[in-house]
UniProtKB/Swiss-Prot annotation:
It comes from the Viruses. RNA-directed RNA polymerase that is involved in transcription and genome replication. Following infection, it catalyzes the synthesis of fully conservative plus strands. After core assembly, which consists in recruitment of one capped plus-strand for each genomic segments and polymerase complexes, the polymerase switches mode and catalyzes the synthesis of complementary minus-strands. This is RNA-directed RNA polymerase VP2. Belongs to the reoviridae RNA-directed RNA polymerase family. Keywords: Hydrolase, Nucleotide-binding, Nucleotidyltransferase, RNA-directed RNA polymerase, Transferase, Viral RNA replication, Virion. Signal peptide: none annotated. It is an enzyme of class 2 (transferase). Residues 561-798 form the RdRp catalytic domain. InterPro entries: DNA/RNA_pol_sf, RdRP_5, RNA-dir_pol_reovirus. One of its GO terms (molecular function) is RNA binding. Pfam families: RdRP_5. The gene is S2.
Length: 1274
C-alpha cells in the first residue's frame, strides 16, 4: 500500500519499515514514532483511510444515524431511575441508540467535544428532577459503554494501518507465506470510512467520542446532525473486526457477514441488546453445525484418558481416520439460527456462511480455520447496563421448584437447622446424604483442627478487595461496638485487610450482628454476556461460610471429577475437551441457567445446612473452630422433651449460616451511573462474592447429576440401549463440572456413537429432572465440546478469539483514571492472548510492536499543573515477552512467539546473537582491559549499551505502579494496624508458639559459623506486614508517589547499570547450540489448534513437534512440590524454592524444620515434609525455580515435558566440552541447564530442534559455585 505508506508521517514511516523487517528497530525510531502518535490529532488516523481505494460491496445505511428518544427509555420508579424496555422484552435494558448531543456542554480545551451539562447534573443530584436524573443516567451509561476499551479505538486502528502500510519482508523460513489480506478488500475498513463521512465537517473528521483516561467525551454536532451513541460502539466493533480479520487471514466474504450484523445492530433501537440476541449466531452456523453432509472424512487424534480418571492424565495414542460412520449425529443449528436472522433481516448472511461451510465437508486445517474465523465475527464488546437493572433483573428471580420438600420431611428444629427424616427419598435425600458424609469426614480429619489450616482458612479472604465495609461498621455500631480506625495508615478502608484488623480483638459472639449486615454492590461487565452484579461479603460472613467451603471442597476432591481442586486450565480442561470431542465419544455440554438464583434456602441450602450440622455431630462438641467457640443450642426434635446441648464451633458456624441463608441477603445498591439510585434490595439469590460460591455450585452440580445417572434416568427412560449405556456411567468417569458448567461424556458401544433417538430421550429426561428442584438445564448437544468457554471440535481446540478482543477491556467503575504505565501490562497481556489464540504470528507480532510503541510513552500532570513524562526503551518490551522482529546482523522474524519473558528470554536472544555481538564489538570498539566472564576482551557491554539493551532491561523491572511513600502514613497508625492484623492471624496461641520457635531456631542456625546458607527465609511473621503493604498499594496513590515513580523511572533509563542481573550474567556463561529437528510428535495433517497450520508456520511447527496433550503437566509444572497450602500472603512456590535452595546448599535437617515451623507447621508435619525433601524427588522445573527459571504460560498448551527430558542436553559427549560437565554433587545443575536449552530452542522460529550445551565459560564447577553464592545472598 504505497499510497497509505506515503500518507504516514515520516517517524511512523520509519516504524512501519522496522515492523516490516526492513530495518532494525532502534530507540530513536521507537521514541520518535511514539512522540508523533501522542501529539498528532486522532482524527488524522481516519484521514489515512482516504488513501485506500476500497472495492467492497459494503453500503452503510443512513439508519445508523437515526435516534431513539432517550427520554422514552428511562423513567423514575420508586425513586429509582430505571431503564424502560422499548420493545416487548424485559431484557431490553441496555444503552439505547440515542442522540447525546443535546445533553453536552463544550470543553474549554477541545471545544468540538463536550461532557454532560453541569446544569443537568445539578438538577439531578440537588433537585432530584426526574428528567435530569434520567438524562444523567443515559449520559453516564452511554459513556461507560464507550469506555470498555484498552484505549481509544482510533489508536488501535492506527496500529493496524501502520502494519498494513508496508508488507513485511520474507523471513527466510521456507514455510513463510505472505499475508493474503488486502486493505482495499476489507469490508470492515470500508465501513469505517463510510461511517466517518457523516462525521466529516469542513474536511476534518470528528470521532463520535474520544476515550480519555477519565472516561469518554462526545462530539458536539453542528446543526442538522446528530451524535447517536451507538455509532461509537459500531466503530469499536468494526475496528476490532478489521484487526482480527487481518490477524486470522479471514476471507473478505466472511468479514462482510460480521460487518452486516454490526450495521444491523447500529440501525436497531439498541446496539448492545441486538448483538446480545444474536451472540450465538456465528458459533451455531459454524462450530455447532459442521460436517453434517455426506463425504465426511479427514484425521482426528486418538486420545486416551488413562485410569484412574481422577488423575486427569491424557495421552495421544495415534490417529483416528474419520468416515461417515463417525459423522456428527446431532442436528445442525441452521433452522433456529436462520429464524433469528430472519427476525433481524439478516438471513442472507446465514446463507453465505452455510454455503462457505458446505465447502468444508472434511475435517482438516482449512475447515477448523473456517470455524475459528466465523466465531471471530461475534462482537467482542464488553456489554454495559445500568447496575440498578442488573440487580432488578438478576436478583429478583425465584426458582420454580416442581417437587418441593414438604414441611413433614423435616425433624423439629435444632436451633436454626432441621435434619431430613430418613424416610424421605429422591434427589433431596441424595443431596443430604452426600453433604452429611462429607461433613463427617471433615469433622473427623485432624488436619482441619490444626491451627495452621484454620489460619489458612481465615486468611483466604483477607485481600485488598472490597467487602461491604460500611455495612459491617454500621451493623456493629447499632449494637454499641465501635470499630477502631487506622486513617493515617493509608490502607484502603474498603478492603477486607482493613476489616480483618478492625475485628481482630473482638470476640466472635460480639460480632454476630455483622452476619446480617447488608452487602454492597459490585459490578462486572462481560463479553457476549449480560453484565452481572456481585455481592462481596464482609469478613464475618465469609468466616461463617468456611464450613460450606470445606465440605464442598471435600466433595469435589474425593467424590466427583470436578476441575476446581487445584487445577489450571491447561492442566485439565484443554486435554479434557480435546478428548471429549474426539469420535466416537459423544459429549453434551451442560449449563445451569441462573445458578446463583437457583440455590436458595427453600431447597438446597436448608438441606445442606442440616446435613452439615448432622455430619459435624461426630466431632468434639466442645471444640472451637477458626475462633468461633462452642455454644449451647436448643434441640427440639422431640416436641415433648426439648433440651439444650452443646455444639461445636463448626456447628455454631452452620447455625449462623443457616440463619443468614434463611433470611436472605439485603443488597445495598448505590448506582454510580444513576443519580439518586440508592436503595436496599432483599434477595434469596446465593451470594456471588462468597468464598464458597464456586466450590459449592460444583458440589451440588455433581451430586445432582450423580442421582440422575444412578437412579432417576434408569427408572425413567424407555430405550433398552440407553438403559444399558447408563449402567456404565458414573460422575467419577462421565461427568466433569465446575460451578454451573458441566460436560457429560457418553460411552460409545463398539466404536459406534450413541443414536440420535437415545440422545434426545436422555436430554429430555435431564431437563425434566432439573425442574424437580428448580434448575433449568441449558443443554447443548452438537458434537462439540464447550467447557469454561473453551471449545473443541474433533479433538482440535478452536480458539474463541472474539472473547479476547484486541480493542475491548472491562471498566466497571464510572471513573477509570489509571496511571499510564499500567497500559504496558495491558500490551503484554494483549500480546499473549494472540499467541494463545494462535493468530498469524508475524502479523500479530508487528501489531503488538505498534501497540507497544504507543504505550511506551506517557505523562502525568499533578494538581499543581506540573507535568512529568517518561519514555520506555524498546528493549523493555523484549524483556517483558515480545520478541524482536530484526536485530543487527540477523534476518527478520527468526525469533519465535514462544520466546519466554524475563531473563530466560534475554538469555535466549543474547545466546543466538552472541557471535555477531562479539565480532562486531571486536571490530568497532577497543578491547576491554580485563577479561569479561561472558564476553572475554570484546567490549560487548558498551555495544549493548549503545543499542539501549541495558536501559530497556532495567526499565522493564522498574515498578509500574506508584509505591506508597512512607512519609504519607503515620508510623503509629501503621504499627497499630500491623499489630491488629498480627492478632487476627495468630488468634491461636499454639500457632504463634510454633512460629516463634521456628524463628528462634532459624536465627540460631543461620548465625552459626558452620552454616552458610543465607538468612532470609519465608515466615508467618512477615504476613501482617505484607497485608498492610497490599492494602496501601490498593489505595489511590497520592501525587507525590506518582511523581516519584516518574523521577525514578527516568533515572533508571538515563543512567542504567551496564550489566544484567547476577543470574542473567551467570546464565550467559552457558553456550547453547541447536541440532537436528526432533521427530514429529503428531501427524502434521491432524488439526490440533485452529490456525496452527502450514499458513501459520511457527505455531504449526511447535504443535506438531511437541503435541498439545500435556502428558506430564502436573508432574513437571505443578504449583507446589513439598508444601501444599500456605497462609495468604506467603508464596507457596517461594517456600518450595527455599527448601530446595537449602538442600542444594547442604543445610542440616533441623534447618528445614525451623523454616517449616516458621510458616506455622507443627513439628510432626515439619518432620514429615523435611524427610521428603530430596533433589531426586524434585522435578526439573521445580529445581530450576530456585534460580528463577520457569515454564512461561505460552508453553502450557504444549507437551514440553518430554522435550526437556529427552531433547535438551546439558552434556553430550563429542559436542559439549568436558569442563562443562557437572559433578555428581552438583547434579541440581542439570535441570537449570536443560531449561536454558529449552528456552533457546523455543525462542527460535521454525521446527523445534535438539538443544545442547556446548561449553560453559569458566567451567560447570565455577558456575555451580557462583550459583551457590547467589543462593546464599538471596
Amino acid at each position: 500500500m504505497e499510497e497509505l505508506f506515503n500518507a504516514l508521517p515520516q517517524p511512523l514511516q520509519q516504524l512501519s519499515l522496522a515492523l516490516a523487517g526492513e530495518i532494525p528497530l532502534t530507540d530513536h525510531i521507537f521514541e520518535q514514532a511514539a512522540s508523533t502518535w501522542h501529539v498528532q490529532p486522532r482524527s488524522l488516523t481516519y484521514k489515512l483511510l482516504d488513501h485506500i481505494p476500497f472495492s467492497t460491496p459494503v453500503v452503510v445505511p443512513p439508519s445508523i444515524y437515526h435516534s431513539l428518544d432517550w427520554s422514552k427509555c428511562f423513567a423514575v420508579n420508586q425513586d429509582r431511575v430505571e431503564r424502560v424496555p422499548t420493545i416487548d422484552d424485559p431484557d431490553d435494558v441496555y444503552v439505547p441508540n440515542s442522540d447525546i448531543g443535546p445533553l453536552l456542554t463544550s470543553l474549554h480545551t477541545i471545544p468540538d467535544y463536550g461532557f454532560l451539562h453541569p446544569a443537568i447534573e445539578n438538577d439531578a443530584t440537588t433537585l432530584r428532577a426526574e428528567r435530569a436524573r434520567c438524562a444523567s443516567t443515559f449520559y453516564k451509561i452511554a459513556s461507560s459503554q464507550a469506555r470498555q476499551v484498552k484505549l481509544d479505538p482510533i489508536r488501535m486502528l492506527g496500529f493496524l494501518l501502520l502494519v498494513q502500510a508496508r508488507p513485511r519482508v520474507p523471513s527466510g523460513l521456507v514455510t513463510d507465506q505472505p499475508t493474503r489480506r488486502d486493505p482495499t478488500q476489507s469490508p470492515a475498513l470500508h465501513a469505517i470510512w463510510q461511517v466517518m463521512q457523516y462525521y466529516k465537517v469542513a474536511g476534518v473528521y470528528y470521532a463520535p467520542a474520544l476515550v480519555v483516561p477519565s472516561g469518554a467525551i462526545w462530539w458536539i454536532p453542528p446543526p442538522g446532525k446528530r451524535n447517536v451513541v451507538s455509532v461509537q460502539y459500531l466503530l469499536t466493533d468494526l475496528i476490532n473486526l478489521a484487526i482480527l480479520a487481518h490477524m486470522t487471514d479471514m476471507s473478505p466474504t466472511l468479514e462482510l457477514t460480521g460487518v452486516l450484523m454490526y450495521l444491523r445492530a447500529a440501525s436497531s433501537h439498541s446496539h448492545a441488546y441486538t448483538l446480545l440476541q444474536m451472540k450465538s449466531v456465528f458459533p451455531a452456523l459454524s462450530l455447532r453445525s459442521m460436517y453434517r453432509n455426506k463425504g465426511f472424512g479427514g484425521k482426528a487424534p486418538a486420545i486416551e484418558w488413562t485410569e484412574p480418571r481422577s488423575k486427569y492424565k491424557f495421552r495421544w495414542t495415534g490417529v483416528t481416520q474419520l468416515h461417515d460412520g463417525l459423522r456428527p449425529r446431532s442436528p445442525s443449528m441452521d433452522v433456529p439460527t436462520l429464524e433469528v436472522l430472519t427476525k433481524y433481516e439478516l438471513v442472507d448472511i446465514g446463507h453465505i456462511i452455510i454455503r462457505e461451510r458446505n465447502a468444508h465437508p472434511r475435517h482438516n486445517h482449512d475447515s477448523v480455520r473456517f470455524v475459528r474465523d466465523v466465531m471471530a465475527l461475534t462482537s467482542g464488546m464488553y456489554l454495559v447496563r445500568q447496575p440498578t437493572m442488573s440487580v432488578l433483573r438478576e436478583y429478583s428471580q425465584v426458582p420454580d421448584i416442581k417437587d418441593p420438600i414438604p414441611p413433614s420431611a423435616w425433624t423439629g428444629p435444632i436451633g436454626n437447622v432441621r435434619y431430613l427424616l430418613p424416610s424421605v427419598q429422591g434427589p433431596a435425600r441424595h443431596l443430604y446424604d452426600t453433604w452429611r458424609a462429607a461433613a463427617r469426614q471433615i469433622a473427623q480429619d485432624p488436619q482441619w483442627h490444626d491451627p495452621l489450616n484454620q489460619a489458612i482458612m481465615r486468611a483466604q479472604y483477607v485481600t485488598a478487595r472490597g467487602g461491604s465495609s460500611a455495612s459491617l461498621k454500621f451493623a456493629l455500631k447499632v449494637t454499641g461496638i465501635v470499630l477502631p480506625e487506622y486513617d493515617d495508615s493509608k490502607v484502603k478502608k474498603s478492603s477486607k485487610i482493613y476489616q480483618a484488623a478492625q475485628i481482630a480483638r473482638i470476640a466472635f459472639m460480639l460480632l454476630i450482628a455483622a452476619i446480617h449486615a447488608e452487602v454492597t454492590m459490585g459490578i462486572r461487565n462481560q463479553v457476549q454476556r449480560r453484565a452481572r452484579s456481585i455481592m462481596p461479603l464482609n469478613v464475618i460472613q465469609q468466616a461463617i461460610s468456611a464450613p460450606h467451603t470445606l465440605v464442598a471442597n471435600y466433595i469435589n476432591k474425593h467424590m466427583n471429577l470436578s476441575t476446581t481442586s487445584g487445577s489450571v486450565v491447561t492442566d485439565k480442561v484443554i486435554p479434557l475437551i480435546l478428548y471429549a470431542s474426539t469420535p466416537p465419544n459423544t459429549v453434551v455440554n451442560v449449563d445451569i441457567k441462573a445458578c446463583d438464583a437457583s440455590i436458595t434456602y427453600n431447597y438446597f441450602l436448608s438441606v445442606i445446612c442440616g446435613a452439615m450440622h448432622e455430619g459435624f455431630e461426630v466431632g468434639n462438641a466442645d471444640a472451637a473452630f477458626m475462633g468461633v467457640p462452642s455454644t449451647i443450642v436448643s434441640d427440639r426434635r422431640s416436641s415433648v422433651a426439648p433440651y439444650s446441648r452443646p455444639i461445636s464451633g463448626l456447628q455454631t458456624m452452620v447455625q449462623h449460616l443457616a440463619d443468614l441463608y434463611a433470611a436472605g441477603f439485603r443488597y445495598s445498591v448505590s448506582d454510580a451511573f444513576s443519580s439518586g439510585n440508592k436503595f436496599s434490595f432483599p434477595t434469596s439469590t446465593f451470594p456471588s462474592g462468597s468464598t464458597a460460591t464456586s466450590t459449592e455450585h460444583t458440589a451440588n452440580n455433581s451430586t445432582m447429576m450423580e442421582y440422575f445417572l444412578n437412579v432417576h434416568a434408569p427408572s425413567h427412560v424407555k430405550s433398552a440401549s440407553l438403559k444399558r449405556i447408563l449402567t456404565d456411567m458414573t460422575i467419577q468417569r462421565n461427568y466433569v463440572c465446575q460451578g454451573d458448567d458441566g460436560i457429560l461424556l457418553l460411552p460409545h458401544e463398539a466404536a459406534s456413537k450413541i443414536s440420535a433417538d437415545d440422545m434426545n430421550e436422555l436430554l429430555t429426561c435431564l431437563r425434566d429432572y432439573g425442574q424437580l428442584f428448580g434448575w433449568n438445564y441449558d443443554i447443548d448437544w452438537s458434537d462439540t465440546a464447550e467447557y469454561l468457554k473453551l471449545y473443541a471440535l474433533m479433538g482440535c481446540r478452536i480458539p474463541n478469539t472474539s472473547r479476547h478482543p484486541p480493542v475491548g477491556k472491562e471498566y466497571a467503575a464510572p471513573q477509570t483514571d489509571e496511571i499510564w504505565p499500567s497500559l504496558i501490562d495491558i500490551v503484554i497481556g494483549h500480546h499473549l492472548n494472540g499467541v494463545t489464540d494462535v493468530l498469524n504470528w508475524r502479523e500479530w507480532l508487528r501489531f503488538s510492536w505498534a501497540f507497544a510503541c504507543y504505550s511506551s510513552r506517557g505523562g502525568y500532570t499533578n494538581p499543581k499543573g506540573q507535568s512529568f513524562s517518561a519514555q520506555y526503551p524498546w528493549w523493555t518490551f523484549v524483556y517483558l515477552g515480545i520478541p524482536p522482529i530484526l536485530l543487527p546482523g540477523q534476518t527478520p522474524f527468526i525469533h519465535s512467539c514462544y520466546m519466554p519473558p524475563g531473563d530466560q528470554g534475554m538469555f535466549s536472544i543474547l545466546n543466538g546473537w552472541r557471535d555477531w555481538l562479539i565480532s562486531h564489538a571486536s571490530t568497532t570498539l577497543p578491547p576491554l582491559r580485563h577479561n569479561h566472564p561472558v564476553w572475554g576482551l570484546s567490549d560487548v557491554p558498551s555495544l549493548l549499551s549503545q543499542f539501549g539493551v541495558y536501559a530497556g532491561y532495567h526499565a522493564a523491572q522498574h515498578y509500574r505502579r506508584p509505591k506508597p511513600a512512607p512519609e504519607t502514613a503515620s508510623s503509629d497508625s501503621i504499627n497499630q494496624i500491623t499489630s491488629d492484623l498480627t492478632e487476627y492471624l495468630f488468634y491461636d496461641s499454639a500457632l504463634k508458639a510454633r512460629v516463634m520457635k521456628g524463628r528462634y531456631n532459624w536465627e540460631r542456625l543461620s548465625s552459626s559459623l558452620s552454616l552458610n546458607v543465607g538468612s532470609r527465609v519465608p515466615s508467618l511473621f512477615d504476613v501482617p506486614g505484607k497485608w498492610v503493604a497490599a492494602g496501601r498499594d490498593a489505595e489511590k496513590p497520592p501525587p507525590s508517589s506518582v511523581e516519584d515513580m516518574f523521577t525514578s523511572l527516568n533515572r533508571c533509563i538515563r543512567r542504567p547499570t551496564h550489566s544484567f542481573s547476577r543470574l542473567l550474567e551467570l546464565y550467559l556463561r552457558v553456550h547453547v547450540t541447536l541440532g537436528e529437528s526432533i521427530p514429529l510428535a503428531i501427524d502434521p495433517d491432524v488439526p490440533q489448534v485452529a490456525g496452527a497450520d502450514p499458513a501459520n508456520d511457527d505455531h504449526w511447527f511447535k504443535y506438531t513437534c511437541l503435541g498439545d496433550i500435556p502428558s506430564a503437566t502436573r508432574n513437571y509444572f505443578g504449583e507446589s512440590l513439598f508444601v501444599g497450602r500456605v497462609v495468604s500472603g506467603l508464596d507457596v512456590e517461594a517456600v518450595d524454592a527455599t527448601l530446595l535452595r537449602l538442600k542444594i546448599l547442604g543445610a542440616p535437617p533441623e534447618a528445614f524444620i525451623a523454616v517449616l515451623n516458621g510458616i506455622g507447621m507443627s513439628d510432626s508435619e515439619a518432620h514429615q515434609i523435611a524427610g521428603r525433601i530430596s533433589l531426586a524427588n524434585a522435578q526439573l522445573v521445580q529445581i530450576a525455580r530456585v534460580v528463577h527459571l520457569s515454564i512461561p504460560s505460552s508453553w502450557m498448551t504444549l507437551n514440553t515435558g518430554p522435550y526437556i527430558h529427552h531433547h535438551a542436553y546439558d552434556f553430550k559427549p563429542g559436542i559439549t566440552q568436558p569442563s562443562a560437565k557437572s559433578r555428581d554433587k552438583s547434579i541440581w545443575m542439570s535441570p537449570i541447564l536443560k531449561l536454558l536449552c529449552t528456552s533457546y530452542a523455543m525462542t527460535v522460529a521454525g521446527p523445534v530442534r535438539t538443544s545442547i550445551v556446548t561449553e560453559i565459560d569458566g567451567s560447570a564447577a565455577a558456575l555451580s559455585g557462583n550459583l551457590r553464592v547467589w543462593m546464599r545472598d538471596v
